């Protein structure tokens, strides 16, 4: 990555509106393709900077292996977005169990396409706050995962 490699994503605050900060180290330059699997709200997957082969494999894997299926597939701006049925990263033990299983499967699919896991980080400062000013506050988005593969 142009002479820099990611070392860590650090969370140094419990504040809801804070994000991870990324630590890099200097390395010899290497041509890599980076993409992000971004988990949004309680039921969305966005594939940022993902090549078309990845989008197809992810789509097929979700349709085949995620019990509750895809509610909608469309672009969010220029980014492919899958809105899943249920709340795989937001609620209910059953949905969460299937969501975790799906994420491990997607990670395996990306590895088979030559991608390596680079880092997981909280990069969204969005959070929900009840309108009645109660203490019910929680982050809307969970960690995003970055993957890299050499450009050949």
Regions found by a protein language model. Give the residues of each.
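Short, structured interface segments
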Residues: 19-28
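Long compositionally biased, domain-poor regions of proteins
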Residues: 1, 5-10, 25-26, 64, ...
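Short, flexible beta-strand-to-coil junctions
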Residues: 12, 40, 49-53, 123, ...
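A residue-level signal for beta-strand positions that form part of recognition/binding surfaces
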Residues: 21, 44, 144
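Short secondary-structure capping/turn micro-motifs that flank functional sites
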Residues: 15-17, 126-127
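Surface-exposed interaction/gating patches
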Residues: 27-80
